[in-house]
């Protein structure tokens, strides 16, 4: 194991740059990420100004990421679940779910908004085309509703459509523990992103911040930190 780091510090900031060799025993999801390229970060343009913790994960494409899961046990488990889901609902996970994703995933934890008392979790997935994303999500909803008793609900808040699909472990099927906190997601569409959360109130607070321009991109501290970094990344963490 080896790591080489360069440390630079002054009164205003501390900067660490360098390289490290990946362990052979590294988590298979980390290995898959490192082998799947990177993606331009833009999610901060829609994220709430209340964001306390922000992780941006980027790769060339979700399809590439899944194919990079060389861990046989994980990949076999994915393939088994995939066949069951596709057979049960009559959908293609690759064509109807993974294909519209551009490769940028933003996970945030925010301070409680006006409509709740608990920290809010948000997952924002950037779409290649939001029109295509909406079309495929509606197709998946239609198939699920036709073939199962799974609850599907839709409500409108201002000009935003809030959707809910009661399917536990939906994200874990595709991306394992990366998104295991989002079990039965509510979701809506904001700009080029499909935005998910475990609670409807979290999405409503998110929409309020977006409408009021209370955005992370306008935070001076975040803006300053981002100015020192490249616009494309595999893993980015801000707190």
Which positions does each model-derived feature cover?
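Leucine-rich, highly hydrophobic segment in Treponema pallidum outer-membrane-associated proteins
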Residues: 1-69, 104, 177-186, 199, ...
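Polar/charged alpha-helical tracts
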Residues: 31-35, 80-83, 87, 99, ...
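Surface-exposed polar/charged interaction patches
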Residues: 36, 72-75, 88-91, 95, ...
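Generic amphipathic alpha-helical segments used as scaffolds and interaction surfaces in large
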Residues: 38, 42, 53, 72, ...
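Short secondary-structure junctions and interdomain/linker hinges
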Residues: 40-41, 62, 76, 92-96, ...
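Glycine-rich loops and low-complexity Gly/Arg-rich segments
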Residues: 41-46, 78-83, 147-151, 220-223
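Predominantly extracellular/luminal regions of secreted and cell-surface proteins
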Residues: 50-90, 145
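Single conserved position on a long alpha-helix in the C-terminal lobe of the eukaryotic protein kinase
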Residues: 55, 95-225
């Amino acid at each position: 194991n080896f790591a080489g780091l360069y440390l630079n510090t002054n009164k205003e900031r501390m900067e660490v740059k360098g390289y490290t060799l990946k362990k052979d025993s590294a988590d298979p999801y980390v290995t898959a990420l490192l082998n799947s390229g990177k993606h331009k970060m833009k999610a901060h343009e829609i994220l709430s100004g209340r964001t306390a913790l922000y992780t941006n994960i980027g790769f060339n494409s979700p399809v590439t990421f899944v194919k990079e899961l060389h861990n046989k046990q994980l990949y076999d488990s994915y393939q088994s679940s995939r066949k069951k889901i596709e057979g049960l609902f009559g959908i293609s996970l690759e064509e109807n779910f993974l294909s519209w994703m551009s490769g940028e995933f933003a996970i945030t934890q925010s301070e409680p908004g006006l409509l709740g008392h608990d920290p809010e979790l948000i997952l924002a997935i950037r779409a290649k085309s939001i029109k295509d994303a909406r079309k495929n999500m509606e197709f998946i909803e239609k198939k699920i509703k036709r073939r199962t008793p799974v609850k599907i609900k839709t409500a409108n808040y201002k000009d935003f459509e809030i959707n809910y699909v009661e399917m536990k472990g939906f994200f874990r099927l595709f991306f394992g523990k990366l998104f295991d906190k989002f079990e039965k997601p509510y979701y809506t569409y904001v700009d080029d992103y499909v935005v998910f959360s475990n609670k409807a109130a979290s999405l409503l607070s998110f929409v309020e911040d977006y409408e009021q321009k209370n955005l992370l991109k306008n935070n001076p501290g975040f803006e300053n930190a981002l100015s020192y970094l490249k616009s494309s990344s595999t893993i980015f963490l801000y707190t």
